[in-house]
Amino acid sequence: SVKLNEEGSYGDIITNLVISFELPDISSLLTTGGRKVRYSNSIGISLFETVELYIGGNMIDRQTPEMIDILSETHFNTHIRNNFDNLVGKFETDDFDENTNTSGRFYLPLQFWFCRTNVDKQFNLPMFLLYNDLIELRCKMKTFNQVVTNADFNTTDSLGTTLQISNPNIIVEYILLDEKERKRMLELSMKETQFFLINQVQKIQVSVPANSGSFKIELKQLKYLITQLFWIYKSDNKVASGRHLNYNYNDSNPLNTVQITFEKQDATDKQDANYFVLVEPYLNKLNNPRKYIHTFSFSIDPKMLEQPNGVCNFSEIHNPEIDISFVDNVPVGTLQIYAINYNVLQIRNGKGVLFHNL
């Protein structure tokens, strides 16, 4: 847990957060079965289970490794994506290379709504207005045995030794306001509530049995104004062998067809699953992901966060469903569905509350 506005903070507005840490050198280590090891692909992301933002003791948003990975694949242009790959130790394939990802300092740029200045420069977190609330990051991490892998992805081996990260820190990008502007905004927030448009992420996860064929997944737990849906499949075996952000099956798409329905009416035609990997991103000004990341947008330009340009109010839809069929012989795994929604952070007298609670 890290407090962002404790005594000694340096600025008024937060625009970026980056987690930085060093990992010990494992290039000379062997597993209990005698295999050489390296850290998992995208170790800078994979090491984490969740990163949560709290204001005044209330969770405002939660980041998962999968969602950060999805945004880096779809919302970043090629140059930014390549730089991001270098920061987190990301490679296009999981093929084992004993000379990569065995040590070093890694950086994880978080992707909360105010951290996406490489996509949209309009958002920020006005820390100076939240003087009566604690702003806090809470991180949950995996064990090292979960993020160290070997050449043949054997799942019965273990390291047989204890590893530890070192020199962790949070890099915070602050903006300093002119004293007159700061005073004016503080006085205004004491007189009337200030409203700030934000994004949040919602998640649905369902178990996928082996040879599951097809099934419908209810989306009724999703709420409010949603701009975009993403969904991915992860096999349990790949997760167990340290391939946490691998969404394929036999190097191809594990999904066969997809259809979205609202109240028994077709919201989309039944499409080949690759339509949502290749065509939907093209139509909605997103990058084509290098992985089997499926997306459907209700927005004309989902990267334009500061100006809503198309949403779907899931609170008003009684029976939203997604109908998915899988290719033959897909193993046991999970299907994760993510939704990006709008919300409003209300600030008055130094305290912040959400307009809608998830």
Residue ranges with predicted function:
Residues 1-358:
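Short, low-complexity Pro/Thr/Gly
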